[in-house]
């Protein structure tokens, strides 16, 4: 990440520190349906090499009551990573999604992106992303599907442009595996994340905490109090049938 981009992100993060609070003013105990099951109202795509809001190949669309992340209109991936951003930033909340992987990976997708997606949390404002930027600076809750045999955990952590602490130690490793089981095939998986501003994150699946860490921060050490939420497109088709959020005090 170059120095110019770091300066851009500092400004974006500071703006989130100001605007994240209003989105958490809704009553605690009431789940908000971020996805209404009908259309993408409240969501904005950012596809690499495209302007914000432009998704000419319809990577993100709604059909049969689910958000479909698909590549029917692509010939080849060509590193066109995409993210679907919710309209409001958040700081303290519990996020729940139901997701699954379908079909085959698009030609040209990187090997590591097979049956791979993510929830990008505490992210930068998409309006500050460069046109050719691949991922928003964020805390990524990595969603992975199994290959039919062997172990491949989900709800892992990746840190594009960020760092976290775990048990009092600053971690510089880009991705850290959770303790989840492996989910093969096209089964629906329910994933939850508890987020407490700059204090801690907990990844939860099947009622069990499979990963937790503290002090999400930018590469320069500035703590992240909140930010954007986005869903990822990384070359393998997937679906989200529920995206809901519970504000926490």
Name each model-derived stretch.
Residues 1-12:
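Bacterial N-terminal signal peptides that target proteins for export
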Residues 22-249:
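Carbohydrate-interacting regions of secretory-pathway proteins
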């Amino acid at each position: 990440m170059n120095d110019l981009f770091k300066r851009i992100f500092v400004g974006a993060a500071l703006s989130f520190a100001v605007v994240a609070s209003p989105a958490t003013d809704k009553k605690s105990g009431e789940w908000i349906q971020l996805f209404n099951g009908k259309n993408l109202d409240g969501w904005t795509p950012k596809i690499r090499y495209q302007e914000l809001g432009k998704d000419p190949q319809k990577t993100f669309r709604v059909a049969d009551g689910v958000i479909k992340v698909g590549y029917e209109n692509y010939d080849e991936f060509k590193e066109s990573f995409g993210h679907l951003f919710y309209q409001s930033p958040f700081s303290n909340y519990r996020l729940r999604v139901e997701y699954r992987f379908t079909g085959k990976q698009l030609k040209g997708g990187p090997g590591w992106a097979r049956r791979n997606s993510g929830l990008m949390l505490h992210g930068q404002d998409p309006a500050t992303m460069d046109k050719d930027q691949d991922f928003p600076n964020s805390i990524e809750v990595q969603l992975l599907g199994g290959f039919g045999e062997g172990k491949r955990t989900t709800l892992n952590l990746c840190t594009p442009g960020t760092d976290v602490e775990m048990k009092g130690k600053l971690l510089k490793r880009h991705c850290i595996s959770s303790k989840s089981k492996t989910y093969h095939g096209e089964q629906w998986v329910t994933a939850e994340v508890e987020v407490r501003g700059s204090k801690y994150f907990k990844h939860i699946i099947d009622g069990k905490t499979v990963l937790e860490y503290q002090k999400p921060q930018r590469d320069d050490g500035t703590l992240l109090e909140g930010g954007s939420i986005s869903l990822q497109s990384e070359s393998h088709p997937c679906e989200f049938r529920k995206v809901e959020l519970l504000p926490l005090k």
